[in-house]
Amino acid sequence: MSLEEAQRTIRALGLCSGGLDSMLSALVLRDQGVHVEWINFETPFFSAAKARQAARATGVPLHVLEITDDYLAMLTAPRAGYGKNMNPCMDCHALMFRKAGEYMRAHGFDFLFSGEVLGQRPMSQTASSLRYVAKHSGFADAILRPLSALRLPETPMEQQGLVDRTRLLDLSGRSRKPQIALAAHYGITEYPAPAGGCLLTDRGYSRRLKDLMDHDAALLPGALHLLQHGRHMRLGPATKIIVGRTQQDNEQLARLYDPQQDLLLKTTGRPGPTVIMPGGGPREMVYLAAAICAGYSKAPETSTTAVQVTGAGRDDTISVLPVLPNEARRFLIT
């Protein structure tokens, strides 16, 4: 380290998931006098809510970037493939480090860090996975993993004296006992469970996403948010509907639907679900959607039911015989 570097504050930018490991990695570096800040990313698949909580708990400044466009470009064809569901963990982490590296370079930080622990996760935190992420981020020489540093090759930051390697840690494996002990040392009493908050690891959401990707090349954010709510049914190659399961579903569907191009269907005079048809559809599909809407309502099974159809320039009522849930099940996206 030069004299000039020794006299200035070293600045590090950390990727923060909001979990305990992220918090500890920042505090370990802050103990050395490094000025630490965090960066977190938002898409329709995950939010920065936990990272904001961690920032409040530790006083570490947090920057949140929205990266949906870049993420979708990666998600359609991840170089390392998907995990158990639609989760492209390795390419996701590489993208996040690349975006963090660009932010680091633009805002004068000295290096990047994360709370990753060698061997903690079987797919994304093996030694080969960490190397893959570093290589494909474009910032391999700027990434420090403080919690497992002593089990990994020495980084340029350590060689240059920007951080003291002897004060970094040698954690590895799936045991959480060392982290819990370290949390007690730092006075951290509240932190989320290590389970992730990414929708792409959810089996049901992933199936609905795969169906959307197979039938709609646009992948607009609104359609991605809709995947979280209701029963999704594929009526035809270009037509799907979403049927509310609960009152909360119904409220979310009514909030998220686009009245300029989507159709919203509800039974009139009887309790029933909110149904939306993204992008509308041909006449026969609208009638089928209305019949399914009636089938999930409190309407009599054997008589016609009035269903109001609004949106996409329409505001009218049609009468249909209900298609009952056991008949509609064949349309479910599973």
Predicted regions and their residues:
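ATP-dependent adenylation/nucleotidyltransferase module used to activate substrates
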Residues: M1-H185, R314-D316, V320-R329, I333-T334
